[in-house]
Amino acid sequence: MDYTLTRIEPDGENDRYPLQRQEIVSDPLEQHVHRSVYMGKLEHALHDTVNWGRQNSLWPYNFGLSCCYVEMVTSFTAVHDVARFGAEVLRASPRQADFMVVAGTCFTKMAPVIQRLYEQMLEPKWVISMGACANSGGMYDIYSVVQGVDKFLPVDVYIPGCPPRPEAYMQALLLLKESIGKERRPLSWVVGEQGVYRANMQSERERKRGERIAVTNLRSPDEI
């Protein structure tokens, strides 16, 4: 499995993500082959324990911009009960949040505000882009709308739809939890390599490609 290694470089030159540099590397667990069995297993167990705590206690920092935010907060009702995934604690401060949900249309004047709030979040942190407007600008192909929040933020999970249903938001949480469980982050600022290994997430479109092609009886528009 290929992993994406993200290095923090404050002095690096990168137009898109000034504080990060990403590259595709091999599985970091292969490095344990050249080390002692005891230390390799111990470090692996520590990573699994830390990731278990992170993925089951995700506190969202909501940044609602339009109608997608209404669908997001619907998942907090008793019908959907997002508390099952440990992500029901909405934070009003970015310093107390684990991931940011950009739900809705991002205007050019709002982009610096979102980026500054993202920079105020403590590591580790993740970003979910919710809705067509946040993903690619949606139907607003105009100078005043940013054509996708990934123009200035590193997005981890994209949620398609206009607007997406609350079930789509909860599925994005599950995908994010699965990705966090496979991450390899520094256990300390003096222990191990100071980089973040993230498994490359396959899109749901590609993952279900065979299932989509195998469908012969398509549903009518009234049944969708």
Curated annotation (Swiss-Prot):
Keywords of this protein's UniProt record, alphabetized?
4Fe-4S, Cell inner membrane, Cell membrane, Iron, Iron-sulfur, Membrane, Metal-binding, NAD, Quinone, Translocase, Transport, Ubiquinone
The protein's location, in the record's own words, is: Cell inner membrane
Classification via InterPro entries: NADH_UbQ_OxRdtase-like_20kDa, NADH_UQ_OxRdtase_20Kd_su
Topology in the lipid bilayer is annotated as:
Peripheral membrane protein
Please list the GO biological process terms of this entry. Answer: aerobic respiration; electron transport coupled proton transport
Gene Ontology cellular component list: plasma membrane; respiratory chain complex I
Q: How is the cofactor bound?
A: Binds 1 [4Fe-4S] cluster.
Among Gene3D superfamilies, the record links this protein to: 3.40.50.12280
The keyword RNA-binding belongs to this UniProt entry's keyword annotation: no
Q: Which cofactor does it need?
A: [4Fe-4S] cluster
Q: Name the reaction it catalyses.
A: a quinone + NADH + 5 H(+)(in) = a quinol + NAD(+) + 4 H(+)(out)
Query: EC number(s) for this protein?
Result: 7.1.1.-
Any idea which positions bind [4Fe-4S] cluster? C67, C68, C133, C162
Q: Does the keyword Cell inner membrane apply?
A: yes
GO MF term list: 4 iron, 4 sulfur cluster binding; iron ion binding; NADH dehydrogenase (ubiquinone) activity; NADH:ubiquinone reductase (non-electrogenic) activity; quinone binding
Biological role: NDH-1 shuttles electrons from NADH, via FMN and iron-sulfur (Fe-S) centers, to quinones in the respiratory chain. The immediate electron acceptor for the enzyme in this species is believed to be ubiquinone. Couples the redox reaction to proton translocation (for every two electrons transferred, four hydrogen ions are translocated across the cytoplasmic membrane), and thus conserves the redox energy in a proton gradient.
Tell me how this protein assembles.
NDH-1 is composed of 13 different subunits. Subunits NuoB, CD, E, F, and G constitute the peripheral sector of the complex.
Question: Which family does the UniProt entry place this protein in?
Answer: Belongs to the complex I 20 kDa subunit family.
Protein name, UniProt field: NADH-quinone oxidoreductase subunit B
Q: Which organism is it from?
A: Pectobacterium atrosepticum (strain SCRI 1043 / ATCC BAA-672)
